[in-house]
């Protein structure tokens, strides 16, 4: 995929539906009684993996051009799959569905692509085992493939060593099948889409500080879900609009949940001209984002803000390379166990472009403001790497080439079309 320099990015976009919310809408709709209607669902490969898994467990899910209809069968309505559940590239599918499968009356196996087979699953196995679950890493390395034999589960009060919405959600979903109230305490609050949506479906989930608790055996009822635009997908156009001369971009109906809005806060700290318009809340808070070209400067990104922007850090690092001054990113060691080692991969790519960047154990230090040039960038099949460097390619001199650039289909199949539509 070749990307060339652009100026005057102008226009209006509706970015794809939020990936986290799309996954959860299908999962919770499958466990609800009645039909759940989902609009603005993300038709990316990861979310389609979730649909595939639940279809294999007997759930009727209809897809058409404008909506998804999930005909749920209740909390105990899933059927034993006749084949391995293929999660593809989706860590969210793997970790959340494991919590559900732990409480079923059947045995199932989960597997995915090479990336999934290297990502850490002990972080969900540990709390599930403490609840009495039977979950095994078939290669004995704490990674997929996993075999899960459903069993009666015990309630737990789990102290998670990582701030991870996937871990928290896995435990809360298993808690629906437990014998008492189950809770998860995190070191820092992670995204809270599970808590919001489970309550909307009829569960009793309470949150206090960094602890979330769920009562067992909830009766979930089918609902209508309007998925907001994904702020992680919007991030690329926020950055492109800020960095490309003469730009004005309006991003419509973007989710601005405070557990996800760290990108906006960092951009503001860097001097960004971003205006929120038409703010509203319908389950999740949303707004239109108006982006104008801005002169950016370095900042420090650390601490409690990290879980709110963990997926946006590759894009923030690219922004920092074009900004004046030094940007320090720390407390982000979680980047090492994403679809790629994003600390190493971002560092490699930016160095190829001529940036001054040093990796650290938990982040990176970027001395911005140097002229950057086109280069050949390896995406390592990581969609967020491909999109971050595509934005870099619209700003730097020369042509930037992205190896395996089509991996964007994981979360944003129309990404390149949308990017080029703004430059016309």
Where in this protein do the model-derived segments appear?
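Structural preference for solvent-exposed beta-strand-turn elements
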Residues: 1-424
């Amino acid at each position: 995929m070749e990307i060339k320099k652009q100026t005057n990015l102008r226009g209006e976009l509706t970015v794809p539906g939020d990936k986290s919310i799309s996954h959860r809408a299908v999962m919770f709709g499958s466990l609800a009684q009645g039909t759940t209607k989902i609009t603005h669902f993300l038709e990316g490969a990861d979310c389609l993996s979730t649909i595939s898994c639940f279809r294999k467990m007997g759930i009727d899910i209809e897809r058409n051009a404008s909506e998804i209809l999930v005909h749920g069968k209740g909390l105990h309505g899933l059927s034993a799959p006749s084949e391995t559940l293929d999660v593809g590239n989706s860590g969210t599918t793997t970790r959340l569905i494991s919590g559900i499968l732990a409480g079923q009356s059947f045995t199932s196996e989960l597997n995915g692509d090479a990336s999934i087979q290297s990502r850490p699953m002990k972080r969900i196995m540990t709390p599930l085992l403490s609840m009495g679950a039977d979950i095994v890493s078939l290669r004995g390395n704490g990674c997929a493939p996993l075999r899960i034999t459903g069993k009666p589960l015990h309630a737990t009060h789990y102290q998670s060593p990582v701030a991870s919405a996937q871990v928290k959600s896995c435990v809360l979903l298993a808690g629906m099948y437990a014998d008492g109230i189950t809770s998860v305490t995190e070191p820092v609050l992670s995204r809270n889409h599970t808590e919001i949506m489970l309550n909307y479906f009829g569960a009793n989930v309470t949150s206090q500080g960094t602890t979330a608790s769920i009562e067992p055996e909830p009766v979930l009822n089918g609902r209508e879900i309007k998925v907001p635009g994904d702020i992680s997908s919007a991030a690329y156009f926020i950055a492109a609009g800020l960095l490309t001369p003469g730009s004005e971009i309006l991003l419509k109906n973007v989710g601005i949940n405070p557990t996800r809005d760290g990108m906006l806060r960092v951009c503001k700290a860097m001097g960004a001209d971003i205006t929120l318009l038409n703010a509203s809340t319908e389950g999740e808070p949303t707004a239109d984002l108006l982006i104008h070209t801005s002169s950016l400067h370095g900042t420090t990104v650390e601490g409690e803000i990290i879980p709110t922007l963990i997926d946006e850090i590759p894009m923030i690092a690219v922004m920092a390379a074009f900004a004046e001054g030094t940007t320090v990113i720390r407390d982000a060691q979680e980047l090492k166990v994403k679809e790629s080692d994003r600390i190493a991969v971002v560092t490699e790519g930016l160095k190829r472009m001529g940036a001054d960047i040093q990796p650290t154990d938990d982040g990176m230090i970027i001395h911005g403001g140097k002229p950057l040039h086109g280069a050949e960038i390896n995406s390592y099949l990581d969609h967020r790497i491909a999109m971050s460097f595509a934005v870099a390619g619209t700003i730097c001199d020369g042509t930037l080439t992205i190896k395996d650039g089509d991996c964007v289909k994981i979360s944003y199949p129309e990404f390149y079309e949308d990017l080029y539509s703004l430059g016309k």
